[in-house]
Structures are given as structure tokens and as C-alpha cells.
Amino acid sequence: MPEQVNCQYDCHCSNCACENTCNCCAKPACACTNSASNECSCQTCKCQTCKC
């Protein structure tokens, strides 16, 4: 299984243009900031190149 840090959900970088079609968060560098609303922090994540 992919290693994740405090995050049961897929994270997306907010500055990724294709966040709706690509998971742009490089795991395991994502952490949930609010598990109730499923908000994740991509502070150390780098957005991958996405093709829409």
C-alpha cells in the first residue's frame, strides 16, 4: 500500500491546474488538516505535470 502520513484521503495541491483530474500531491508528503471536512495540506508536496 502507498505510504501516507496522517491522511486517509487523496490529497491535491491547490495550485495544480488539473487538480480535478490528477492527484498532484506527492505521497507520503501530505497531511490532513481537518479530517472532518477532508481538507489536506500539500505544504511539502510538489505538483506533478498534468495533462488535461
UniProtKB/Swiss-Prot annotation:
GO terms for biological process: cellular response to copper ion; cellular response to silver ion. The metallothioneins are involved in the cellular sequestration of toxic metal ions. Sequence repeats lie at residues 43-47, 48-52. This is Metallothionein-2. MT-II might bind nearly 10 mol eq of Cu(+). It comes from Candida glabrata (strain ATCC 2001 / BCRC 20586 / JCM 3761 / NBRC 0622 / NRRL Y-65 / CBS 138) (Yeast). Keywords: Copper, Metal-binding, Metal-thiolate cluster, Repeat. Belongs to the metallothionein superfamily. Type 10 family. GO terms for molecular function: copper ion binding. Induction: Both MT-I and MT-II genes are regulated by copper ion in a concentration-dependent fashion, and both are inducible by silver but not by cadmium salts.
